[in-house]
Amino acid sequence: MQNLKQITEQARAALDELHDKGIEALENFRVEYFGKKGHFTQLMQGLRDVLPEERPAMGAKINEAKQTVLEILNAKKEQIEQAALNVKLEQERIDVSLPGRKVEAGGLHPVSITIGRVTKFFSELGFSVESGPEIESDYYNFDALNIPKHHPARADHDTFWFNPELLLRTQTSGVQIRTMEKKQPPIRIMAPGRVYRNDYDQTHTPMFHQIELLYVDKNANFTELKGLLHDFLRAFFEEDLQVRFRPSYFPFTEPSAEVDVMGKNGKWLEVLGCGMVHPNVLRNVGIDPNEYSGFAVGMGVERLTMLRYNVTDLRSFFENDLRFLKQFK
């Protein structure tokens, strides 16, 4: 017991001398008195040499002395840490007038910008947005659109097939068919979405975006179609462009045309395709072509964007190069 009293007094005295020392000195003290070979640890180990009937009382006294010294040690540690914090706070000054870190806002992808501009224009004319599945059946992608079985668009080198009846849609025209099956004329819709074709070069990618328009009503005619597209192209390019309609062929429209605008280099540039909905397409969805007529328009979003912003390589839209994309913010 005399040894316990002596060790306790020595510990108290040592702690008093550490009032202006750092955390490292306190850690050395802890190891000296409470480590594996520390003074209090050895006292506890020495209990095995004490008579069994005296061990409980002796153990309680050692633990009491140990707890007292630990409380002083912890209090001293908190005191030193607080003093160090106060010094640090005194030395560190925060200039609240300094500007904060600049948060860089993101921007819309150029393809999204074009889709937004196109849909806004036509929505103001009463067209609503419709959507459909990207994994499409050959009926909605080809058969219902009056595309013959031998048409080259059905070939494996042009189309991604899952099996003889399912494919990744090559156009959003299937949305037109599904809409006409569900709704009765008058119908006025636009169908923006992703489409897929097996092609990859400077002006083609395996996935791209398309917007199609469909208008079905009594007495819909090509004159209305021409006027609509004239107004759209001038609004989209924000110029009074020269526009021409060239006779063309699409299985799902008759007559059909491709639309060109005059570029700044004096050359005609193709921008979209259009035509009057083929009577067979109307019959396939249960609409009488003798009573109703309609027109359809198909445009590639990336192509419109390239022409609008003078982009030379369509693949740039999908390479996630921030140097390119930041130009459209």
Swiss-Prot record:
Species annotation: Actinobacillus succinogenes (strain ATCC 55618 / DSM 22257 / CCUG 43843 / 130Z)
Record field: catalytic activity: tRNA(Phe) + L-phenylalanine + ATP = L-phenylalanyl-tRNA(Phe) + AMP + diphosphate + H(+)
Cofactors, names only: Mg(2+)
Top-tier EC class: ligase
Compartments (UniProt record): Cytoplasm
Keyword Cell inner membrane: no
Record's protein name: Phenylalanine--tRNA ligase alpha subunit
HAMAP family: Phe_tRNA_synth_alpha1
Biological process annotations from GO: phenylalanyl-tRNA aminoacylation
Family, per entry: Belongs to the class-II aminoacyl-tRNA synthetase family. Phe-tRNA synthetase alpha subunit type 1 subfamily.
Cofactor note: Binds 2 magnesium ions per tetramer.
Entry's EC annotation: 6.1.1.20
Any one GO cellular component localisation term in the record: cytoplasm
Gene3D superfamilies in the record: Bira Bifunctional Protein, Domain 2
A single GO molecular function term of this UniProt record: magnesium ion binding
Record-listed Mg(2+) binding positions: 254
Location, primary (coarse class): cytoplasm
Entry keywords, A to Z: Aminoacyl-tRNA synthetase, ATP-binding, Cytoplasm, Ligase, Magnesium, Metal-binding, Nucleotide-binding, Protein biosynthesis
Annotated Pfam families: Phe_tRNA-synt_N, tRNA-synt_2d
Subunit structure of this chain's protein: Tetramer of two alpha and two beta subunits.
